[in-house]
Regions:
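Acidic/glycine-enriched connector segments
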Residues: 1-120
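Ser/Thr/Pro-rich, acidic low-complexity intrinsically disordered regulatory segments
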Residues: 114, 120-125, 129-133
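Long, low-complexity, intrinsically disordered segments
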Residues: 134-138
């Protein structure tokens, strides 16, 4: 039997594809996720959905905003999503980096209590807005 290093994890056998990125720390993958999403979506509109989230979620949201991808924040799902939704609604960022996020125009909060139909409509609206925007190429 082959020995396995203690700092490894098995790959999920039901997944068909894996994207391996450089880095040694949690969060190093955040900018790569945004880049891969851009490549996979090609010219189709895409959004990032923030549900709950911890420390790394801030990096994921920042990377999505830098990639000019809208982020739908599900308020009521906990932790980072609730903090970010509260900042969006109050206009009171915690610091300079959150001020950049909340004033970017790419973040949109919706309460989970509004239900599936309202969330689905917001996603459709964000995707329609993206697809009708002029392309960067001209």
């Amino acid at each position: 039997m082959q020995s396995v290093a203690s700092d490894t994890a098995p790959l999920e056998p039901h997944h068909t594809h894996f994207v391996l990125v450089p880095g040694k720390a949690w969060g190093d993958e955040a900018p790569w996720i945004a880049r891969v999403a851009n490549e996979l979506s090609y010219k189709a509109p895409s959004v990032t959905i923030l549900i709950n989230g911890g420390k790394i979620a801030w990096l994921d949201v920042t990377s999505s905003v830098k990639a000019r991808r809208p982020v739908v924040v599900l308020a009521g799902s906990g932790r980072t999503a609730d903090t970010l939704a509260a900042m969006l609604r109050s206009g009171q960022p915690v610091n300079d980096s959150t001020a950049t996020l909340t004033t970017s125009g790419f973040l949109h909060a919706i309460d989970l209590e509004q239900g599936f139909d309202a969330i689905a409509q917001l996603l459709r609206d964000r995707l329609t807005t993206i697809s009708s925007a002029p392309s960067k190429a001209g």
